[in-house]
């Protein structure tokens, strides 16, 4: 039987945690740690979960300061890379390539203000919360269990009476493909091991097979609907706009027709 939570969100170490949760249908809004991560292998990065916990418990007070950022150059995803020296976190998905740091920084602050406020409000409205960590498949790294205990203790005390559980997804290449091992470490901490390397030709070794990680979560956990009616309507409108844009459609009937034509081998515009 699936274990149901009021809120599920990822705490790294990379964006693959958020991707797995979203694909599993367990997260529908954006949170502050979805698309930022540590610089793996750098001094102090291995206590990443502790630092993120401290930021949440401080309610993100003064966490984004311009003097803490260092430009690292352009990223292959079309964004500029910036490293936050104090937080030991790298921002790979925010700054438009070639943009002025000073010019874009207020936009960054406002975006993360919304995400931080949203997360804190949802935590306060929730009784049972699940934190997900998805380790990178190419690194022999395991989130220290003492860091998990620290996170549960600090968050539970700060947001009492909310209950926080942690699930750790770890890539174990000694397991057969499709084999899954669940290890309840202690009350509130669960380790799930499987081989979730992405074996597609040319795949990025840092990225897991998101299909495997998302199915693993979806089969074990569920989440109640925590969005307001306004947020649901806005999300549906956004998804609808994406679908229409894909086929150059301006209304539902045009979208259905062009999608059908594309499926039949046409060019999606109604012309074979």
Q: For each predicted feature, which ranges?
A:
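Well-ordered, non-membrane alpha-helical segments in soluble/globular domains
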Residues: 105-117, 141-157, 210-215
């Amino acid at each position: 039987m699936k274990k149901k939570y009021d809120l599920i969100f990822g705490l790294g170490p990379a964006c693959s945690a958020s991707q797995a949760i979203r694909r599993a249908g367990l997260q529908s809004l954006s949170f502050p740690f979805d698309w930022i991560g540590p610089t793996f292998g750098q001094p102090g990065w291995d206590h990443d979960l502790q630092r993120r916990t401290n930021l949440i418990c401080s309610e993100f007070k003064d966490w984004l300061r311009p003097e803490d950022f260092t430009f690292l150059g352009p990223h292959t995803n079309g964004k500029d890379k910036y490293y936050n020296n104090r937080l030991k976190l790298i921002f790979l998905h925010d700054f438009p390539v070639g943009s002025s740091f000073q010019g874009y920084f207020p936009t960054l602050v406002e975006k993360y203000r919304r995400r931080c406020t949203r997360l804190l409000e949802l935590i306060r409205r929730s009784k049972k919360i699940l934190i997900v960590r998805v380790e990178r498949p190419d690194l022999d790294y395991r989130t220290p269990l003492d860091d998990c205990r620290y996170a549960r203790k600090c968050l539970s005390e700060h947001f009492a009476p909310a209950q926080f559980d942690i699930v750790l997804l770890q890539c174990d290449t000694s397991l057969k493909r499709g084999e899954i091992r669940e290890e309840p470490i202690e009350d509130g901490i669960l380790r799930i091991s499987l081989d979730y390397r992405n074996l597609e030709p040319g795949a990025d070794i840092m990225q897991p097979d998101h299909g495997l990680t998302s199915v693993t979560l979806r089969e074990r956990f569920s989440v109640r609907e925590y969005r307001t009616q306004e947020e649901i309507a806005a999300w549906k409108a956004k998804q609808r706009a994406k679908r229409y844009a894909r086929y150059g459609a301006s209304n539902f009937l045009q979208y259905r027709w062009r999608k059908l034509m594309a499926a039949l081998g046409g060019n999606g515009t109604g012309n074979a």
